[in-house]
C-alpha cells in the first residue's frame, strides 16, 4: 500500500488513491447481530481533545475538506466565534485555486483545543470541515504507527460518524473516509491513533462487527509495497481473491461455500449488473493471507460447470497495468537479448526496397527469421529497417558483405541493432574518452609532419584551423581545447597526390612588392601569438576553406590590414585559382563513393572530411570542427548518406551538439546553446 496517512495532515487525494484496497468487498451473509456502536457524546469528544492537548501542546490546527470557494474571511468569521485567531492561511496552488485545506494558528494551545472541540465537522458551504492538530513531524505522519484501515463501510458513514465510532478507544490523530470526485463514499477509510495499543484494541473490538447493518473489516494499515510481490520472489500478502468465468447461476452463498474449504472467509460476492444479472466474476475475501494463497493455488484453472475458473490476487487497475508493463519490458529485454548479435539495423534504404526484396537480398547469407522495412502512415518507406538471422555468424557475414553496397542509387548502411539507450550511452562514452586529458597524447598520422598535441601543450590553441605547409615539414595543427579527433579527419585536405599548401591568415606586415610565398616560423611562441585574434580567424576561415577566389599577387583584396592569405594550391597561381563549390551534387556523391572504393582506407577520412566540413560549417560555424570530427567516427556509408541528405545531416549535427552540451563545460564549448538554437530555428 501507499505511505501511511498523515497524522497531522489529512490524507490528500493522491494519498488516498495510493491506499485504495485491492477490491471492495461486500458482506455475503450477516453474522450474528452485533449491537450498533452508540455515537460518542460531546463529553467524550472534549475529553479526547483535552488528552490530545496534553500530549501534543500545539496551537496550530489543520482544517481539511474545505469547499473550493471557502476563503480566509469565512474561516476567520467561524473560528473567531470560539477564540481569537492569531493568523490563518488557505493553501493554494500556483493559480491561486484552493487546495481544500488551511491552517489556523491561535495564541495558545487551549484556544486551539477549544476550537477543535467546538467546530470539528461543522458545515461551511454545506460541507463539514475536518479539524486536527497540525503535526509537521514527517516521521510521525509517515510511520504508519497506529494506523487502521476500515473497509466495507456503508455509504452513510462519513468522517464524523467514523470519528465518533473510533474515538472511544483513544486519541485519534487522523480520521478520513475516502470519497470520489462527487463526494460519495468509496466504502473504506482510515483512522490513525496516537498509540499502537489503542489501534489494536479498536481492531480487536470492531473487526467483523456491524456498522449500519454492514459487516466491516478493520485491520492494520499495510503499505502497498508490503502487499505486492517483492523482488526476491516472496509470496505476496493478500486476502482478497478475484474469481473470473463464474457460471451465471452461481450465488454469493454458493461462491462462499466453494471457497470456504480453504479457510475462513469474511465476505464473498458475485458482481451483478443494473438488472441484477451476474457479470460472471466476483471476489472472495479470506481472513488470513495463507488461506487466500492456498485458494489461488488450488482453484485456479479448475472447471466449475462448463467454465474454467481464473482465480488470482485481486488487484487495482493501476497495479494490473504496472504488472503488465513490467512483464512486457521483461519480455522485450529477453527478446532483444535472444537476438543480440543476430539483429541487423539497415539505413539509407532505397525507396523501391520492400519486405520481400529485403529478405531476398539478405537470404543468401543465412536463414532470415524476420525482416521489416519501416513505413510511415502513408505506407511509404522511412528509409530504414531490420533483418534478423538465426545466429550471430550469419548476421556478421551479411553485415560485412552488405555494408556500403550500392542498392539502387544509395549506399546501404548495415550495423548491429542497438537499443536507443545503448546508442546514447556509447556516444556519450566515446565523446568522454575523446575529451579526457589522459587520451590526448599525440596521434600518429599517415601524413608526414602532422601530430596531434593535447590541449594546453606547446602547440595548442583555442581554435580549430590548422596550418599545413609544403610537404608538412615541421608543422603542428592547432586543436580545440578538450577535443581529440585525429588530424587526418580535418577538412581542407582535398583528395590528391599530397596535402594542399594551405595556411590560415595571421597578422603580418603587408608586403609592398610581390614576392615569394611567406614561410612559416617553427617557434611555438610565434605560433601561439598568431591565434590570438579569434574574430579575424572566423572571418577568413570560410574563404580559405571554400576556395582561393580572385586574388592578386598572392593577396586578397578584401583581407583586413595586416592579413596575408596564401594560395591553396602550390602548383597554381593565386590569381587564376578556380572557385570551388562545397555543396555536393548527386554526381559528386556518386563519384566520391567510387573514389573511396579505389582509395586506400587511410585516405577515406581525409576525403570525407573535405566534403563534410563545409556542410557542417553552414549549420554550426562555431563548433564545426568538433561536430565534423564526431560525425567522421560514423560508418562510411552513413557519412555518404549525410552528404546526400540535408535533413539527416541536420539531425546528426543536432545530436552531436546535444552530446557537446551534456559533456563539455561552458569554457570548452563556445556558445553551443546559442548556436544550437540558431541552427534549430533555421
Swiss-Prot record:
Domain RRM: 59-136, 146-223, 239-316, 342-419
Positions where Phosphoserine occurs in the chain: 600
Gene Ontology BP annotations: nuclear-transcribed mRNA poly(A) tail shortening; regulation of translation; translational initiation
SMART domains found in the cross-reference section: PolyA, RRM, RRM_1
Tissue specificity of this protein: Expressed predominantly in immature flowers but also at lower levels in mature flowers and siliques. Detected in tapetum, pollen, ovules and developing seeds. Also detected in primary inflorescences and immature siliques.
A cellular component annotation (GO) from this entry: mitochondrion
Recorded GO MF terms: poly(A) binding
Official protein name in the record: Polyadenylate-binding protein 5
Protein source organism: Arabidopsis thaliana (Mouse-ear cress)
